[in-house]
Amino acid sequence: MISREANIAFEPATAKAYRVLEHMIVTLELAPASFVTEGALIEKLALGRTPVREAIQRLAWEGLLDVRPRAGIAIAPLHPGDWLRVLDARRGVEVVLARSAARFVTREAADLFHEAALAMQKAVISGDVLAFIQADKALDDALALAADNPFAARLAAPLQTHSRRFWFRYKADTGLAESAEHHVALIRSILDGDEEAAAKDAKRLMALLRGHAETAATR
């Protein structure tokens, strides 16, 4: 079994730059609506200009950064109502991925699902929100691998990142156990090879997130 940690240890510099910057955006280390320079990010990540620049370009395409000539790089703002829009776009593709994952899940993907579920449960017990966020990302990566549908996976990935960022901002203080329960149910259905149950659990997870988003939008 090749763990996610092992994969990370050998990842290309551009992929590492993307992963680190994405995490900084999701966890609000790069504050919403703030500005940063490319030079500051290159210095912070210590990965070289080209990998960081390529990661910035990808994050800009995904709507998480806005590169403004002579002004710097703007971190995407967080408007509560946008969480609902993200979830409306995400719901259908998550069902597609869940069904496909249940149909095509491999041993490698199953191992990654088990690893993500265990990490998520440990994060709940310890109340470690950052560890939970990382486990959620690992689960999404396992789902993309298991589904064997790169078109759906590429569509889902930025929506998952945006949603994770909203969740961290508006629900991380109270939502760990309930969120983990829904994620683990989805994993179980996928590993059972039950396409209908996996689709149903994906819809339940999206409904849970939508409830959180509706609450955030009316605060």
Predicted segments — roles?
Residues 86, 113, 132, 136, ...:
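Hydrophobic packing residues in well-ordered alpha-helices of helical domains and bundles
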Residues 82, 105-109, 128-132, 148, ...:
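Residue-level recognition of alpha-helical structural elements
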Residues 89-105, 137-173, 212:
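Hydrophobic, amphipathic alpha-helical faces that serve as interaction scaffolds
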Residues 9-13, 114-121, 126, 168-219:
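C-terminal all-alpha effector/ligand-binding and dimerization domain
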Residues 1-103, 210-219:
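Short linear motifs at protein or domain termini
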Residues 21, 51, 82, 139, ...:
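Hydrophobic alpha-helical segments typical of transmembrane helices
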